[in-house]
Design a protein with these regions (language model features):
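Basic, helix-initiating cap at the start of DNA-binding domains
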Residues: 1-40, 57
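Alpha-helical DNA-contacting segments of helix-turn-helix folds
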Residues: 25, 59-66
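Amphipathic C-terminal alpha-helical segment
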Residues: 98-102, 137, 142-146, 153, ...
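Amphipathic alpha-helical segments that line or abut small-molecule/effector binding pockets
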Residues: 19, 86-105, 183-187, 191
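Amphipathic alpha-helical packing segments from all-alpha helical-bundle domains
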Residues: 87, 99-109, 116-149, 155-160, ...
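N-terminal intrinsically disordered/low-complexity leader segments
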Residues: 1-12, 71, 76, 119, ...
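Short hydrophobic/aromatic patch on the recognition helix
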Residues: 42-52
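Amphipathic alpha-helical linker/stalk segments
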Residues: 64-95, 101-102
């Protein structure tokens, strides 16, 4: 006999089902059955269809949950502001990498090789998603702002560049299997690849300049 679900408000019920479904989707991809998900959630299979309408809608909602940066924003806001700039940024990149790894794992399991389309999203959903992403970037930029005088670019631009680097350096295929650690990403972003000599003027603010000199101002005597 299928278990009878404890009565919950609709949004709480959906959230509980998604919490049970995400690990199964990461492991089995679309091969997972609604019966497996129902058993993991401790509910009757029909409850899934009452909550989401279809398995496809459930999978899409799971992807939307994985892409939701709410937990990322909260984690960034908890980073210790008393840490030095480099250490503070390493923690932020580690948090970002942890989220990216979960997203990549889900997308690989679902055999999705490009950014997913959320067919069931409303314009309000899309606006909220953009707003949340903007808030995540702002939370990261706020971590850098106390030391903005050490940066050659505004914190928002540094976050954008670090974000691009973190994505490509964390993705197992984009990185060619050479995934970088948070420390390596931050050291590259802040200090680049070129040794810095006394009196060296800052490079132009482009991709090459960022790669060679990083985002941080270099004082005399930097090596």
């Amino acid at each position: 006999v299928s278990p009878r679900a404890t009565p919950l408000p609709p949004e709480e019920r959906r959230a509980a089902i998604l919490a049970a479904a995400l690990p199964l989707l990461e492991e089995f991809g679309t091969e997972v059955s609604t019966k497996q998900i129902a058993e993991a959630a401790g509910i009757a299979e029909g409850t899934i269809f009452r909550a989401f309408g279809s398995k496809d809608a459930l999978v899409e909602a799971a992807m939307a949950t994985a892409f939701d940066p709410s937990d990322l924003i909260h984690a960034l806001e908890q980073v210790d502001r008393t840490l030095p700039l480099r250490e503070r940024t390493v923690v932020a990149v580690e948090i970002s990498q942890e989220r990216l790894r979960r997203v990549f794992k889900l997308l690989f399991a679902l055999r999705i090789r490009r950014p997913p389309e959320f067919k069931h999203s409303t314009p309000m959903d899309e606006a909220r998603r953009k707003r949340q992403n903007d808030l995540a970037n702002a939370a990261f930029a706020d971590l850098l702002r106390p030391d903005a005088d050490q940066l050659r670019l505004p914190p928002e631009d540094v976050v954008r560049m670090i974000g691009l680097l973190t994505f490509s350096a964390t993705h197992p295929m984009v990185s060619g299997g050479h995934v970088l650690t948070a420390e390596e990403i931050v050291d590259f972003a802040f200090d680049g690849l070129r040794k810095h000599r006394t009196g060296q003027p800052p490079a132009s603010e482009d991709i090459v300049g960022f790669a060679l000199d990083g985002a941080r101002h270099h004082d005399s005597g930097d090596d």
